């Protein structure tokens, strides 16, 4: 059994938010009620969509097999070797779940959902800075930090190991401009404090790393797991240039997302888990094989190396992940939704991108998978 190590939030080291980087955020407010992951789980249950898995399931292959064989949201409540911990998968496994995540009534026609979300994109909602939040319930310093304390799954037989990041946020800033990015870049767990981060060459994170390496410095990155679903949706999106991912998340859920400063980065105050760390300059490691959205395994021989320096988590955190590889799974549902909003870019060739978006918009999942295999280069996340 893995036990959660913790310190109380009163022991959180570091300056007040007003002192970070020598300036105060323009506005700081008290924490308000936020549509966090736990509220979303309750919505799924109230709507009769959630299946609570009460039998013991193995993190090694079992979580993934259950998720691929059942087309509904799953909350695993008994995980082998991790007493008391939980995992949510398939949270956005169909349009009804997406409706619930973004505050729509279940019966609203899908065309109206897309039209309303398209309208929402015209009104970015800037994030709200707060001084505290559930993410500060427990703070674990580097000296005792162990990412293996969480029930990180090995999702499929094709996977070479356990994947920490499959439905999460990687938050970073351009060291030259300070521009913020939140994206979903898959992460393979390498040990107690290390993981890979796979990012395509055209991604914002890759540019941030490139600029940091040009300066010869490490790039700070925060990994948020179990953030509100609107944030995960936005992190997977190709944001319009006039807004960042947190603006987009606020627009989609019609409510400002709440962020708290951790070092030089802002992280979701209501995430279940936040891992602070660094990408080391000039270091590349192999990531994979890993069963990707295309239904085939791939490998990235030039993934970044992430080293965790501090861990924050809610009490009794819920791990959030995604079992990729099956046509119509929640990653496909997300891609289809984003394509219908003209917000999908998987960094493929122009022809491949055009073809994929055509089929994603029509929810032709198997055909979109096939097109994805044609252009597969093992770097398929934003």
Region roles according to the model:
Residues 4-8, 21-305, 309-382:
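Extended, highly charged
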């Amino acid at each position: 059994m893995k036990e959660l190590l913790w310190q109380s939030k009163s022991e959180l080291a570091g300056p007040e938010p007003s002192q970070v980087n020598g300036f105060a955020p323009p506005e700081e407010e008290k924490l308000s009620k936020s549509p966090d992951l736990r509220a979303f789980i309750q919505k799924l249950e109230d709507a009769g969509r959630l299946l609570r898995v009460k039998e013991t399931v193995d993190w090694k292959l079992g979580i993934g097999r259950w998720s691929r064989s059942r087309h509904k949201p799953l909350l695993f409540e008994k995980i082998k070797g991790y007493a008391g911990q939980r995992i949510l998968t398939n949270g956005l496994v169909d349009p009804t779940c997406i409706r619930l995540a973004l505050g729509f009534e279940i019966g609203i026609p899908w065309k109206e959902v897309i039209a309303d979300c398209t309208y929402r994109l015209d009104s970015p909602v800037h994030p709200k800075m707060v001084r505290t939040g559930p993410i500060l319930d427990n703070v674990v310093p580097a000296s005792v930090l162990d990412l293996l304390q969480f029930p990180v799954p090995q999702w499929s037989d094709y996977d070479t190991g356990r994947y920490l990041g499959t439905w999460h946020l990687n938050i970073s800033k351009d060291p030259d401009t300070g521009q913020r990015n939140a994206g979903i870049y898959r992460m393979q767990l390498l040990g107690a404090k290390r993981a890979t981060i796979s990012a395509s060459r055209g991604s914002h994170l890759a540019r941030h790393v490139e600029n940091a390496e040009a300066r010869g410095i490490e790039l700070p990155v925060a990994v948020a797991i179990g953030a509100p679903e609107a944030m995960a949706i936005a992190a997977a999106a190709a944001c319009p240039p006039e807004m960042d991912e947190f603006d987009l998340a606020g627009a989609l859920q019609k409510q400002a997302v709440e962020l708290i400063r951790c070092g030089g980065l802002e992280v979701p105050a209501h995430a279940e888990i936040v891992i602070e760390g660094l990408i080391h300059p000039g270091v590349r490691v192999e990531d994979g094989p890993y069963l990707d959205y295309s239904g085939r395994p791939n490998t990235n021989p030039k993934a970044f190396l992430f080293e965790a320096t501090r861990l924050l988590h809610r009490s009794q955190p819920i791990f959030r992940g995604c079992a990729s590889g099956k046509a119509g799974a929640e990653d496909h549902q997300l891609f289809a939704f984003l394509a219908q909003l003209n917000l999908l870019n998987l960094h493929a060739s122009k022809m491949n991108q055009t073809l994929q978006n055509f089929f994603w918009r029509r929810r032709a999942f198997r055909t979109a998978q096939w097109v994805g295999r044609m252009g597969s280069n093992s770097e398929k996340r934003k």
